[in-house]
UniProtKB/Swiss-Prot annotation:
It comes from Thermococcus onnurineus (strain NA1). GO terms for molecular function: double-stranded DNA binding; RNA binding. GO terms for cellular component: chromosome; cytoplasm. This is DNA/RNA-binding protein Alba. InterPro entries: Alba-like_dom_sf, DNA/RNA-bd_Alba, DNA/RNA-bd_Alba-like. Pfam families: Alba. Keywords: Acetylation, Chromosome, Cytoplasm, DNA condensation, DNA-binding. Binds double-stranded DNA tightly but without sequence specificity. Involved in DNA compaction. It comes from the Archaea. The modification N6-acetyllysine is found at K11. It is found in: Cytoplasm; Chromosome. GO terms for biological process: chromosome condensation. The gene is albA.
């Protein structure tokens, strides 16, 4: 999957990310990856579910990957942060 078919979830409203995913599919993408870290994980799940249930019912979840990233903190230690990648597929 090309890197341009990735939507990174942050602090913006959920519908901004939903629109980004729908735009990717409308431009011909067969798969779109929704990625998030930490507190944005629940927002990523919301984005995937809103796309599937409200806007594009033919889209399905192909794969869900979860993991942990070690991020450096201001005082030199490392903090573990959870990550998720939800791959949506349009048949």
């Amino acid at each position: 999957m090309a890197e341009e078919h990735v939507v990174y979830i942050g602090k913006k409203p959920v519908m901004n990310y939903v629109l980004a995913v729908i735009t990717q599919f409308n431009e011909g993408a067969k798969e779109v990856s929704v990625k998030a870290r930490g507190r944005a994980i629940s927002r990523a799940v919301d984005v995937a579910e809103i796309v599937r249930n409200r806007f594009l019912p033919e889209v399905r979840v192909k794969e869900i990957k979860i993991g942990t990233e070690e991020l450096p903190t201001a005082d030199g230690r490392t903090a573990n942060t959870s990550t998720i990648e939800i791959i949506l597929e349009k048949p």
